[in-house]
Amino acid sequence: MTTQVMPDRQQIEALVRQAIRGVVAPQSVPTARFSGAANTPGWVDGKPNLRVSISARHCHLTDEHVEILFGPGAKLIPEKDLYQDGFYAAEQTVMVVGPRRRMLPNVRVLGPTRPFSQVELAFTDSISLGIDAPVRHSGKIDGTPGCVLVGPAGTVQLTQGVIRAARHVHMNFADAEHYGVADGDMMQLVIRSPQCSVTFDELLVRADKAAKLEVHIDTDEGNACNLDSATEVLLQKQPAGHSDCACKSH
């Protein structure tokens, strides 16, 4: 992995002042761009109701980093509930700074806080930042590149934690039984849209008793399949003969 040269203190302080001025409109929160049945969870007509959501670039923060970035005693303020119960897009955003002062302003913070901070980007985002972010599943950040996070009250330099989030599907145990899969298995997602149908292999199953059936893909993947115009989505077991992706072990 190439060595990254981060901005010096003077450059970072200039970026802090820019963040405080709020010169760029806030980044939109992650949204769903296709749903099986009017956004309702549970089962419909005897089948699990599948929802496919595009996850825009975002970050997760520790309690300590929230206070550094937004001030002593600061807490994440929920702005919009996400589809999975207990998770939300916060009011707060940060600026993500990569090598050579390349930056992404107003990156949304998702809550609740975590034991480690992590930044999730699409491939085009990582190119824009000048960071060679690997494809990893959430939480698998060992050996990944870092970045600088800039908030209105301070900065945090991450030594690791910048990833391109691997596509995955959340489901509960009843959903998993329906599809004949278990936590950690790989599935296949077929998205049919006019002149732009795409099949995504290597979709990691993340099964939990309280989860709702929801696929997460990033903005590049959503644009590639023209998800806004999708006429049908099909979630199925990955066909025999397809090898597991290398990212499964990361």
Model feature map: region roles:
Residues 51-54, 58-99, 105-152, 157-190, ...:
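Short beta-strand-centered segments at strand-helix junctions
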Residues 224-250:
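Extended, aromatic/histidine-rich regions of cofactor-dependent oxidoreductases associated
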Residues 105, 194-203, 240-246:
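Short, Lys/Arg- and Gly-enriched loop/turn segments at beta-strand edges
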Residues 99, 192-194, 238:
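Solvent-exposed coil/turn segments that connect beta secondary-structure elements
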Residues 1-46:
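Protein-protein interaction and targeting regions used for scaffolding, dimerization, and localization
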Residues 3-6, 15, 34, 38, ...:
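Extended, non-catalytic scaffold segments that flank or surround catalytic motifs
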